[in-house]
Amino acid sequence: MLSFRIPRHTFPRLLQYALAVTPLFLAAAIVNTQSPPADSSSHSSSTAPPCIAFTFDDLPAHGPLPAGETRAEIATKILAALRDARVPPTYGFVNGATLESEPQDLPVLQAWRAAGNPLGSHTWSHMNLDQNSLEDFEANVTRNEPLLSKMMDNEDWHWFRFPYLAEGYAPAKHDGIRTFLAQHGYKIAGVTMSFADYLWNDSYGRCKAKGDNAAIAQLQSSYLAAADANIGFYRRLSHALYDRDIPYVLLMHIGAFDAEMLPRLLDLYRSRGFQFITLPEAERDPFYRNDIDPHLSSNPNTLEAAMAHRKLPLPPQPVPPAPLDTLCR
């Protein structure tokens, strides 16, 4: 990362590339990074626990649907885990186009709202800004609005998450979409913690279909290990930059394996000292000011980009230890 303008989607794509071409390296890539750097002296880190807002993309459906399960059942598992862990209202980001081909999945959105959780926009069809014109992307965002307005009634649905975290690599497109979002009252849902949870859902579907419980146990272990390692990775970046923990926003997906693992994942974050907060609470922090008001410059819009801007060395990001693409094939 050599420039100041670094699109958010760079890191998931690099992670997928590494996963595909270096499976032997990946097995040794996760390191114990759960503690902040030793030279951190911020009083805030010693007096206040780290906070995190969970968010879920791709509602109402993400990834393969294992045999015998429904999308509504996946959502029910996720909602139950959030409720049992006393997680405050949690934004789910919607692709309305899914309901055209799978109208039976509308209960997912209804259950999300009935549980007191808000919805935001993920575009109508999960459109990639970098692969489409600005005009087509804007129309795709607008097309999602009637569904969100209906589902949210008088509550705030003007939160937007870029599909693929692609915010427009070309400066004109990048600036153009931020102007559009600002003019239409949107706030951008940032991402300051992720462990590429979506990578496990395909493998889980295959392994469950084969009844390979040993492989599923491997997936469970590597999923939690990746989450734990990335807790340390992002906390180190925050402490290197600001000598404190910013309130983190975690990117998740409404996948079958995510639903299976969410109770244990929430336990992991709590065991690491995290308190759960809402997305609006997290983005009150000054770090997110350019996402709350997209009229402002978006740089830096991630912890990685902030590190690059400050010319601070970026440690290797942990990546999953298992060859997920080939498991249970």
Model feature map: region roles:
Residues S42-L165, L250-L251, L268:
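Active-site beta->alpha N-cap acidic-glycine motif
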Residues M1-P12:
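N-terminal secretory signal peptides that target proteins for export/translocation
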Residues D84-R86, E100, G190, R244, ...:
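C-terminal domain-boundary segment and adjacent tail
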Residues P107-V108, G176-I177, R264-L265:
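A short acidic, amphipathic alpha-helical/loop segment
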Residues Y17-A29:
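Bacterial N-terminal signal peptides
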Residues P66-A67, S101, M127-M151, A170-H184, ...:
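Alpha-helical scaffold elements lining the catalytic groove of polysaccharide deacetylases
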Residues P118-S121, L147-M152, D212-G232, P300-L327:
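Short, basic, helix/turn surface patches
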Residues A28-S41:
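Signal peptide processing junction and immediate N-terminal pro/mature segment
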